[in-house]
């Protein structure tokens, strides 16, 4: 991913809020979307292979505003592009603002997005987070599985995917990689929208224990107060 380093987005101390989406232009709204599926500039991403952003309802059978997809969608979504078997967009996020928690083993990530395709064709999109150390060495990667034709019910649209896990100790950067793959037809109909990557704190073991104990006590108290299923018999 060395060629994408110029797109690194620093999560500075002032913006290192836990739970905040760190992907820039993850919703394809920064910039004008294409009205016919053609190539346009995609701000915030290092793009190869023709990946583009397209208006919902663009001519040519692209997803319409009423098709399956995010409820809070904007005007645009990502698409694979014209006459290309594979296209890619990469964004590199600097995790240095979280280094203390990450290196203490106290950080987890959430990766999510809406992925999809066209009609009964098998073109698809995938989203991957590749964690690297300060020297650029890959430590760990996690991907959202592509949405297949069956997942979409053979209809044009997008389906939500989500994954989370621990951020590896030593991680200083994360590459966010959006891949679009064409399997048939001339247009690469891998689609994606509302992509998100966020960092959260790992709950302390004591917090889980206290929560579990509280739930057990609540259940015990509830059982003690529960009346008999047959009701009480009045005294003779």
Language model features by range: what are they?
Residues 16-116, 124-133, 138-169, 173-200:
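Aromatic (Trp/Tyr/Phe) and Gly/Pro-enriched flexible surface segments
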Residues 90, 203, 222-223:
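Residue-level micro-sites within transmembrane alpha helices that shape
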């Amino acid at each position: 991913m060395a060629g994408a380093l110029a797109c690194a987005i620093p999560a500075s101390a002032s913006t290192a809020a836990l739970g905040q989406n760190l992907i820039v232009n993850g919703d394809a709204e920064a910039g004008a979307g294409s009205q016919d599926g053609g190539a346009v500039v995609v701000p915030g991403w290092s793009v190869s292979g023709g990946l583009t952003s397209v208006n919902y309802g663009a001519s040519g059978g692209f997803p319409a505003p009423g098709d399956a997809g995010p409820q809070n969608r904007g005007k645009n979504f990502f698409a694979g592009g014209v006459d290309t078997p594979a296209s890619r967009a990469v964004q590199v996020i600097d995790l240095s603002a979280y280094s203390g928690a990450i290196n203490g083993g106290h950080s987890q990530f959430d990766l999510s997005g809406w992925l999809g395709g066209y009609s009964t064709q098998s073109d698809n999109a995938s989203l991957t987070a590749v964690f690297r150390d300060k020297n650029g060495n890959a430590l760990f990667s996690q991907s959202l599985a592509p949405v297949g034709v069956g997942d979409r019910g053979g209809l044009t649209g997008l389906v939500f995917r989500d994954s989370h896990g621990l951020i590896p100790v030593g991680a200083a950067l994360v590459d966010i990689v959006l891949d679009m793959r064409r399997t048939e037809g001339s247009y690469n109909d891998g689609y994606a929208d509302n992509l998100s990557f966020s960092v959260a704190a790992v709950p302390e073991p004591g917090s889980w224990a206290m929560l579990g104990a509280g739930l057990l006590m609540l259940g015990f108290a509830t059982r003690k107060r529960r009346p008999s299923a047959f009701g009480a018999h009045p005294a003779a």
